């Protein structure tokens, strides 16, 4: 297995892949005998020559398992080599072309000097935006990375070894790890519990704290200083969020107890890494008062610490008597340990002995910094100490801020019971809004003691949030997200229940959390401005927003709108929703924080992060932005420290640019109107074609028969079920993730492109060819949209899809593939006409070739999957467990080859 599946013109990369392939071949011979390696090569050759299906059909189940494991393992190894290569290339690019942040600040500096009319800038404005900036990637569990943590750990070890060429034992250690990888089961034995998922996220957060964020925030401050803008030492331009343990929408496994347990786990990790950081500071800060002084404030603070911490080790008092910074660092370590113990036992906070919140910890650290700055210690203060302060400001003593999400129906179910209002559920959105806002304004409390189980579970969540904020501070949980928000009343319903739990009270001028509507379907997106207008024009709710610092968060869902309307309409309606939300927020003097619920695949809003952020409507990134980092992409983005740094830095840089350089329209009103009209035509025609496909009564039967989606649940990818609870069968009950998953596995990838060709054709035939070309060159939104569609088309393989259909789908349903093929051909033709290329990715030859060669290795797995799916279905309930295992392994293999699940 020595041929590289990577076509990049880079000797080091090709060498690494060849080397890992050779090691895998040796492992196969060592572990299973030469017959397996011979079979791998025979199948690879046969597939290339078009006769692979015949050979695969004759394989035993056991041989099928071994074969798919071999190909899947090869993809895992190739992916690692690619990651290491990307890290090398990025390191070189940083040296030759500067970092993402450096380039962003260069563009801001150029804008400062240019002072273009209508886009004038001042350093004071920039300083204000930077001081209030908040960029927050939010980790979610679903869709879960298909590979187990045990597999990812082995792959991480291989990456470390590849990155250490001077290690004399490198070859032996690589061989050892590949053997370990082969002997590790790729499949989970059971569905992960929510706390298992939380631990997985904490694995990455720990590494970000220790390896990535200190350097990124240090660089951010340095780059801004280059244009005379100071980033306040305790500013929080970057922080992290977490849904794991808080997202209960459709996941019955998330209870108030699970949320509490997840937060406790998170905080324990945060304190552990913070103590380690303080120990590093303690070791370094050997500054002696025999040589330089210390401020009276620092000395008094140390004295107070010694008074309140009688357990302070005498050894440190003796050895560090003239080293106040070490004494202060030791006191901080002690207070952090007491904080950890307080959380573990539930004991009350003791002032000056443990920390009530992050602000108290930062105050101690700033005291040390100020003292150093006052006593010839500027380089020391702005070195490790400043990096530590900025990092702790980013993570806090909670590591990440947890969001809580629940479906809007859950809140109305509670209110129906506790208010006793006849026909409450049947009332209109406006009627409910009027009733509920009066309850809010009057601070009405209800008796919730007689609630049924589901209602009690919902109320218990709000009680738990209140308790967690009491225990862990205001940064523990900041936002409650209401999914399926169809009207303003859906959000207010959650606020009224929060009022019952003591989280909100207008009489007490208290709002301990904020509330965010999640707009997911096309109808909700189109109503976005109207919903926000109704909320902000209401005095009671506007008071809540004022109590939250005049910031209103709105979450946009990319997945459901795509499943509902197709990619063109989904992307366009999300773009339009952002414009209307921006305008309403500006009207009411509110800072808008948009939370982008983007997935890993293009069909769920995925794509290059930098381009996506730059393509957002002007003024919609007002220094505040959140975006999901979904389970399937976290490993690819954060597994290596260098790649984690790249991802965090480009996200911060793009958000900085979008905030400062995209505050007003770049085009005239007439131009924007013409583009909008043209895009509306593309969207309408695309929507019509997409709906014509998915509304056909037999489409669900085609989808389920031509894809392995029904096996998704057996992979135990996450704690959340793949279907919505209490929903009927068919496509409506299917979540967007398995919808994309199924189409992707069978290489039809309908959610990523279907309908776009019809939309572009309609615009072209309406005489808009020149306008489309202008949009492609000058409109970031349209450029990014077309680029993402082109990438998905390149990954689509309808010749392989035909194998699925001919083998697995009843003949009377084959016409669906004909429809998909026709739209595919049209979309490719329209994209090539628009871009002027002769082939997909024609301007990215290396990437195109990489995908082409990967397909040569993916094809055997696909053909095996088709064969195994047929055998499993033919066997029905009596299917051999080994046969089912072989099938599940093919699903993992395709996910590894395509680098996403759904």
Predicted regions span which residues?
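Glycine- and acidic
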Residues: 4-7, 187-206, 256, 264, ...
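Active-site phosphate/pyrophosphate-binding segments
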Residues: 679-686, 690-723
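Active-site cores of enzymes that catalyze phosphoryl transfer or operate on phosphate-rich substrates
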Residues: 342, 397-492, 496, 500-506, ...
């Amino acid at each position: 297995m020595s041929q590289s599946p990577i076509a990049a013109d880079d000797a080091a990369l090709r060498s690494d892949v060849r080397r890992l392939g050779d090691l895998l071949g040796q492992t196969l011979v060592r572990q299973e005998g030469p017959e397996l390696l011979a079979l791998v090569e025979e199948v690879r050759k046969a597939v290339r020559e078009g006769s692979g299906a015949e050979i695969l059909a004759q394989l035993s189940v056991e041989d099928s398992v071994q074969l798919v494991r071999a190909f899947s393992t090869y993809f895992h190894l190739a992916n690692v080599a690619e990651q290491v290569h990307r890290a090398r290339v990025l390191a070189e690019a940083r040296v030759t072309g500067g970092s993402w942040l450096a380039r962003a600040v260069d563009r801001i500096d150029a804008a400062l000097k240019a002072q273009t009319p209508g886009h004038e800038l001042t350093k004071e404005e920039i300083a204000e935006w930077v001081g209030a900036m908040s960029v927050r990637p939010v980790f979610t569990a679903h869709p879960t990375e298909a590979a187990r943590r045990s597999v990812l750990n082995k792959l991480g070890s291989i990456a470390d070894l590849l990155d250490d060429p001077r290690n004399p034992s490198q070859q032996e250690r690589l061989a050892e790890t590949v053997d370990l990888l082969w002997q590790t089961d790729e499949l989970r034995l059971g569905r992960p519990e929510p706390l298992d998922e939380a631990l997985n996220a904490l694995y990455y957060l720990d590494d970000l704290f220790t390896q990535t964020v200190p350097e990124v925030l240090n660089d951010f401050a340095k780059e801004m200083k280059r244009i005379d803008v100071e980033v306040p030492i305790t500013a929080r331009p970057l922080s992290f969020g977490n849904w794991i343990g808080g997202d209960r929408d459709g996941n019955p496994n998330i209870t108030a107890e699970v949320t509490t347990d997840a937060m406790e786990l998170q905080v324990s990790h945060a304190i552990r890494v913070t103590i380690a950081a303080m120990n590093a500071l303690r070791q370094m800060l050997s500054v002696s008062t025999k040589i330089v002084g210390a401020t009276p404030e620092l000395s008094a603070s140390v004295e107070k610490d010694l008074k309140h911490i009688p357990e302070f080790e005498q050894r440190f008092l003796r050895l560090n008597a003239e080293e106040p910074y070490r004494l202060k660092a030791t006191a901080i370590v002690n207070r952090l340990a007491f904080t950890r113990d307080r959380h573990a036992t539930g004991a009350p906070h003791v002032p000056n002995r443990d920390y009530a919140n992050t602000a108290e910890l930062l105050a101690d650290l700033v005291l040390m910094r100020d003292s150093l700055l006052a006593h010839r210690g500027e380089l020391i203060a702005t070195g490790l100490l400043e990096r530590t302060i900025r990092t702790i400001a980013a993570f806090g003593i909670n590591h990440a801020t947890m969001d809580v999400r629940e479906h809007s129906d859950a809140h109305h179910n509670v209110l129906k019971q506790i208010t006793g209002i006849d026909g409450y559920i049947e009332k209109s959105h406006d009627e409910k809004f009027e009733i509920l806002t009066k309850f809010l304004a009057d601070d009405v409390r209800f008796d919730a003691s007689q609630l049924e189980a589901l209602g009690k579970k919902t109320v218990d969540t709000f009680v738990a949030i209140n308790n967690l904020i009491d225990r862990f501070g205001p940064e523990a949980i900041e936002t409650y997200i209401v999914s399926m928000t169809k009207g303003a009343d859906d959000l207010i319903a959650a606020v009224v229940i929060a009022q019952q739990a003591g989280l909100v009270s207008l009489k007490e001028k208290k709002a301990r959390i904020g509330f965010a509507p999640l707009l997911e379907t096309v109808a909700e997106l189109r109503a976005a401005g109207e919903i926000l207008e109704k909320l902000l024009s209401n005095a009671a709710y506007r008071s809540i927003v004022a109590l939250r610092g005049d910031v209103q968060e709105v979450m946009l869902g990319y997945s459901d709108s795509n499943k509902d309307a197709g990619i063109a309409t989904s992307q366009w309606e999300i773009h339009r929703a952002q414009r209307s939300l921006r305008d309403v927020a500006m009207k009411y003097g509110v800072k808008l924080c948009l939370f982008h619920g983007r997935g890993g695949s293009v069909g769920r809003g995925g794509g290059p992060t930098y381009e996506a952020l730059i393509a957002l409507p002007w003024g919609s990134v007002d220094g505040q932005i959140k975006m999901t980092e979904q389970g399937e992409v976290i490993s690819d983005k954060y597994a290596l420290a260098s790649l984690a740094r790249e991802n965090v830095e480009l996200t911060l840089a793009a958000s900085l640019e979008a905030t400062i350089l995209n505050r007003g329209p770049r085009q005239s009103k007439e131009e924007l109107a013409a583009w909008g009209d043209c895009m509306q035509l593309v969207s309408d025609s695309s929507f019509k074609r997409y709906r014509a496909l998915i509304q056909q009564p037999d489409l669900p039967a085609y989808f389920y028969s031509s894809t392995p989606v029904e096996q998704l649940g057996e992979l135990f990818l996450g704690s959340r079920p793949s279907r919505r609870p209490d929903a009927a069968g068919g496509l409506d009950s299917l979540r967007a993730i398995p919808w994309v998953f199924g189409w992707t596995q069978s290489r039809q990838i309908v959610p990523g492109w279907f309908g776009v060709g019809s939309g572009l054709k309609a615009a072209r035939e309406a005489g808009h060819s020149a306008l489309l070309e202008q949009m492609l060159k000058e409109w970031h939104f349209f450029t990014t949209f077309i680029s993402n569609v082109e990438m998905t088309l390149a990954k689509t393989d309808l010749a392989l899809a035909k194998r699925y259909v001919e083998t697995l789908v009843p003949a009377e349903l084959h016409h669906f593939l004909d429809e998909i093929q026709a739209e595919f051909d049209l979309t490719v033709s329209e994209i090539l006409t628009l871009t002027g290329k002769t082939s997909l990715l024609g301007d990215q030859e290396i990437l195109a070739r990489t995908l082409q060669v990967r397909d040569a290795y993916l094809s055997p797995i696909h053909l095996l999957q088709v064969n195994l799916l047929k055998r499993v279905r033919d066997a029905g309930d009596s299917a051999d467990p080994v046969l089912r295992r072989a099938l599940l392994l093919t699903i993992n293999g395709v996910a590894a080859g395509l680098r996403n699940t759904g």
